[in-house]
Amino acid sequence: MLFPIRDKSNKEQAFNAMLLRNKALIWHICSDYSLGKAWKVEDCMQEVIVSLWRYFDTFEGRSSERTWIYRVATNTMLMLRRKDSRYPTTEQIEAHGELNNMSGEAIDDNCQLLRQLISGLPEENGMIIRAHLDGFSYKEIAEMTDLTEGAVAMRIARTKQQLKELFEKEMQ
């Protein structure tokens, strides 16, 4: 089923079909932003679904359904992160302290460390590198961010270098 939906009587059916086609993508985005914490992933998924419903009528078909969902979901996660950052939880404070005190031998899961490092990047760079890691092309990322493909390529290269340096620093 293609967007945009002009027949409002089928809106709910089309929306549910879109969710079914893309539930793995939505879960993946929420999982990355929630650092894999199951309860937080569920909360994030609910927020993303609400946002997708809210903006469902605005999709104009200039990008793929997958690209549009990624952009709405990522923007929702960034909004939640900004909201959460105003009031850090005890868990966030403890996690930050643990990360700073870890040695290379204490890190069991390099993917978890990478997720934490990505979550510390500036919002747009974090979104771009996540989209790249999720397999989106430079063209698709450019559509999501309103940047040129060249700018996307440059940001990805710089962000990879920055993450490499941060990762190596944490592993020492």
How does the language model describe each region?
Residues L78, T145-E170:
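DNA-recognition helix of helix-turn-helix
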Residues D43-V50, R54, S63-N75:
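Structural recognition of an alpha-helix C-terminal capping motif at a helix-to-coil junction
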Residues E98-R130, D134-D146:
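Amphipathic alpha-helical segment used for protein-protein interaction
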Residues T58-E60, R71-E91, I107:
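Arg/Lys-rich amphipathic alpha helix in sigma70-family domain 2
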Residues M18, N22, I26, C30, ...:
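Residue-level preference for hydrophobic side chains embedded in well-ordered alpha helices
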Residues K8-A17, W27-E47, T58, M144, ...:
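Short, charged helix-capping/linker segments at alpha-helix termini
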Residues V48, V72, I128-I129, I141-A142, ...:
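Hydrophobic positions on the alpha-helical face of helix-turn-helix-like DNA-binding modules
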Residues K23, W27, I49, G126, ...:
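C-terminal flanking helix
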